[in-house]
């Protein structure tokens, strides 16, 4: 898998130059996502609670989708659907048609879902629940929670590894009651087949 790292500041400059009028202004680009095997670039506008699809050359905004709150993460399933989780105490998970970017479904998804990924081995969506301190496995066909797994405090990011058989979860805070905590927190590993 090839990863492309683009500084958010470069995307911010591109977004400013791509905005042709006031309603295209992007105040706070926050996250970048690649879809369609790296052919589509998406950026979030945190202040506008928007997901923006950029042109292939990165010079124009092709389409915007507005959500109930800021987008925290996005993934794509093998059918081309985009799955988005949004911030907030009553966080939401959205399913979008990958071509039209129209919202197909919207469900409540815990307290501040912070990351989402599709795992081909389990054929499930996995959602890190930051303030529930849980990892949820969700069936994309039914959008029902299949499993809730307790992980460390404030899980904020995750990645598949070992042939997609495991998930590495990064937690924002260590397991200690003090607020004087080090910057480095803890990592959890979840075996997707045995949970």
Where are these regions (language model features)?
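Bacterial N-terminal signal peptides
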Residues: 7-14
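Positively charged n-region of N-terminal signal peptides that target proteins for export
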Residues: 1-4
